[in-house]
Amino acid sequence: MFSNLWHTIKRNWKMSIRAIPSELDYCDVFEFNADKDFYERTYYKFLRYKDNYAVFENLLTQEKKYIFYADLEKLFTEERTIKTYFIYYESIKNLYKILDLVKNKDVEFYISDNRNGLSKTLSFYKIKQNTKVKDNHIKVYFKENDRYYENDLSIYEFPDELTII
């Protein structure tokens, strides 16, 4: 079943996400789960277009997904079903995606870290507008007890999975 789905995605992935009409309310999303190595069906609500990405909301958890047009593998059908998976980038690519956004404004995001089978920890960060990478480090502000503290973060410390909020 999942291999058939993958062939369907590959055959149709060049369709533009902009084909989704603004009045679209709900859609099915087949999301690739990297931990379990298979696709699982998730229900998302399409919220809006913003800059160079689209915003979806998970109907069960209210978690928001920010999906870049250029990176979304998708299929849009008459039944308003999007068969896709959200790509988990390599660490350095995550950072440059964020830097692309901070040209115009501050960006707040969190990193969910689940390395070496340890329990997940959630770290909140903010990157200021027009931030640049210098000597493989970037100036970030991490949130602790509702306050932000300045810190330098190596671009190689970014994990594979990252969510912008």
Regions found by a protein language model. Give the residues of each.
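Short beta-rich binding modules
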Residues: 87, 94-95, 111-142, 160-161
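Basic/aromatic-rich interaction segments and small domains that mediate binding to polyanionic partners
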Residues: 38-66, 129-149
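Short, exposed beta-strand/loop patches in secreted or surface proteins that constitute
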Residues: 21-23, 45-48, 98-102, 127-132, ...
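Mixed-charge, Lys/Arg-rich low-complexity intrinsically disordered regions
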Residues: 2-25, 84-101
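Terminal low-complexity interaction tails
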Residues: 1-7, 11, 20, 131-165
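Intrinsically disordered, low-complexity, charged/polar segments
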Residues: 61-93, 146-165
